[in-house]
Amino acid sequence: MELLQVLEPEECPEKSKWYALVPCGQSPSSRVGHTCLYLPAAKDNGKGRIVIIGGANPNGSFSDAYIIDLDSHEWDIPDWEGLLPRYEHASFIPASNSDNIWVFGGANQSGNRNCLQLLNLEMGTWQSPSVTGTPPSPRTFHTSSAAIGDKLYVFGGGDKGPDPVEDTQLHVFDSATLTWSQPETYGSPPSQRHGHVMTAVGPKLFIHGGLAGEKFYNDMFCLDINDMKWEKLKVKGDVPSGCAAHSAVAFGKHIYIFGGMDISGALNTMHKYDIEKQSWTQLKYDSPLPPARLDHSMCIIPWRVCTELKNRNFVNSGDDNKLEENLEGKAVSKREDLHQRKKDEEGSSEERDIQLCLIFGGMDTNGEIYSDCNITIIDDHF
């Protein structure tokens, strides 16, 4: 298997290439079923952090968290306490309070969970607040992309082994009021399934794929929370095969899915779904791909790059002693002035953020469990 090129801090990645991200310090152990979130920077011009929560390996489930500090390019292990061990859970950050991280559901070795826990980043302790309303039944529900505003939306999930939970009810948790509800929906919802992806784009929720027993799905459903009507979308293009345990993120008008498994085994393909055109595209890469995997995590992160500014202010007529005009219409006449100003301009640079897709961990169908970070550029470059 070919190794991926390592992307260094502030290095600008090339389009259509995968890279390895290798922060310094102690990285998490190999794991599956964890979640991954981007935490915006608390200070001006900061790069932010990536937090990985929970997960499991054959020895047990985890109650830890790891952070990648994008400013220092280092792993950090926060001393947060109180998280119940869990994997294949959901996590989200409310829009109105970016200092709070919520987790829901998942499982540990003794069975499925349906509890909620809250971490306030300033306090640094996981809490189990009292909530009202009827919660979903215990289930696995592996996502970090199913929240709109302050609300987490839950549909389907795993019961035991290959079997999904029986209900096809939409469950909504409002973190502002600490309330569960089951709003009435219209139209035909997706069939019972687990291992699907559920991704929010604006006021719409998209569900793709999943598994029920031995049946893999490749369908795509949409629910607009403004009218609460389910719609099975008629998609076209490079439609992915039926798959489950894949990951999804949304950026702009596109949804990206990576990996998972189908009837042939683990996958390492990336597909892009155009929401407006209802069309799938399988993305092609000029580099090796990450190892095939399922039950990993994925998120969008900003990546600070440093770009050299090229000189665009001067026109060379072939005679440096002649009067020259820059693009602003100002005249310059001395060769020394021209050369010095060109040197100053060419030596300057600017910083900007581009968007990358990051995947961490997961496993293949042969039992190989990963602890690697892989990234690729996604924003308007395909």
Identify the residue ranges that each predicted region occupies:
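Kelch-like beta-propeller repeat domains
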Residues: 1-382
